[in-house]
A protein has these predicted regions:
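N-terminal accessory/pre-domain segments preceding catalytic cores
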Residues: 1-133, 138
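Active-site neighborhood of thiol-dependent amide/isopeptide-bond enzymes
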Residues: 118-171
Length: 171
């Protein structure tokens, strides 16, 4: 079944071609959706990620990791009263993707969603954005460093981060 994650047929075709090229490059071993029971939209979103994510992410993390994160994106959109109002393009390019910088990928999306959902579920989209910004400020303060960008959970644990780490944490 055709999903509605990408409603523009021309863009969907371009993405599908890019996805097919990526899988041809890395091999089907690195894209295994068997037993994941994806919906059509989840499958299309996962293909979108694979079409454009860094090749190292494809080979370093199992398909199930990205599928779980895709599901969380759709879960948040469904459970938040304003989720349906997030424009398709913004949802596709700024909610579904996991990577922000060169940070290690972790389970931060699940951890943060569980911590934030009750805090924002009764707010307008505008107020939810502000509340999440306040939450980020409560958890992490700016501190310069020369090290590799820390993962969102590492930034949470240390409660400090550079501007890139703060943006990675916020997203």
């Amino acid at each position: 079944a055709q999903g509605t994650f990408i409603s523009n047929a021309a863009y969907r075709t371009t993405m599908q071609q890019q996805f097919n090229e990526r899988i041809k490059t890395v091999g089907k071993t690195f894209y295994n959706t068997r037993n994941l029971n994806l919906t059509a939209d989840e499958n299309q979103a996962l293909e979108f990620l694979y079409a454009y994510m860094p090749l190292a992410d494809i080979t370093d993390y199992p398909t199930s990791f990205f599928a779980d994160n895709v599901r969380l994106s759709f879960q948040a959109r469904k459970e938040m009263p304003w989720g349906k109002d997030v424009p398709e393009l913004l949802f596709r390019h700024f909610v579904v993707p996991i990577r922000v910088n060169n940070e290690a990928l972790d389970s931060s999306r699940s951890v943060f969603y569980n911590e934030l959902k009750n805090r924002v579920k009764h707010l307008s989209m505008h107020d939810a954005i502000l509340e999440i910004n306040h939450w980020c400020h409560e958890k992490v303060t700016y501190q310069p460093s020369d090290a590799r960008t820390s993962s969102p959970l590492q930034t949470l644990r240390t409660a400090t981060g550079r501007c890139g780490e703060e943006s990675t944490f916020a997203v």
